[in-house]
Every structure is written in structure tokens, then in C-alpha cells.
Amino acid sequence: MYAVIRAGSKQFRVSPGDVIKVDSAPHSESGKLEIADVLAVSNGQGKFGSPENATVTAEILGDGRGDKILVFHYKRKKQYKKLQGHRQGFTALKITEINVDGEKFTIDDMPKKEAAPAKARRSTKKAAAAE
């Protein structure tokens, strides 16, 4: 089960249990955020084109700032150099449930991912000689 939502000016493909970082969003102290701007929902058969009565509920994990991006300006032959740094603020959200037409899908409803089998290690000549 996944949904495509619009948060801020970006679109995200989310499932229950996912953690996403959206541009700093104004939020209340309740710790919950309901996103009603759902673009598509899929649970095997897809519902595309702004499904009605679809919302995504998220838990607010906190605010933060991203990595620093350096912006360097210079003018050749004029000895002019300017270095600026910028850190974009974000709000971390954990998707708790997807509601579609009265049905709620949570992390407990998601199929469990099976662990991939361990790959067999290839022996090298040095390792074979040491044994």
C-alpha cells in the first residue's frame, strides 16, 4: 500500500512506516499532521487522479536543518570573491497511516519484508593458501 502526496512544492511516494523530510512546515504541538493533498493511492489496483476521501496521517519527529550548501561568487581579474553558505530547514515526518474511503492502512497491515539470503563469499588465492 502506498500513496503519492504533495507536501510543500514536492511530491513523495509514501507507505506506512516511511520517514520523509519536507520543507519546514508550520505545525502544531500535537505531534500529528494530516495531509489531505493525495494525488494517487495504490493497493494492487491503483486509484489515480486525486482520490476523494483520501488522507495521509503523519507523526512529527522534529525540525532540523540540512547539510550546508556553499555558494561561491567571483569576478575574474577584479579580485572579488564572496562565499556564502545556506542550510535549508526541514520537518521530519513518519507516515503512520493511509486512509482511503474509510479504510485505514497502518504499518501493521504492510507485508513483512523477508531478509535476503546471505551471499556466498568467494575465496581468494591468499585465503585458500592460508587454510
UniProtKB/Swiss-Prot annotation:
Domain of life (superkingdom): Bacteria
Transmembrane regions: none
GO molecular function, one term: rRNA binding
Alphabetical list of InterPro entries matching this protein: bL21-like, bL21-like_sf, Ribosomal_bL21
Protein's job: This protein binds to 23S rRNA in the presence of protein L20.
Assembly behavior: Part of the 50S ribosomal subunit. Contacts protein L20.
PANTHER family: 50S RIBOSOMAL PROTEIN L21, LARGE RIBOSOMAL SUBUNIT PROTEIN BL21M
Protein name: Large ribosomal subunit protein bL21
Species whose genome carries this gene: Koribacter versatilis (strain Ellin345)
Gene: rplU
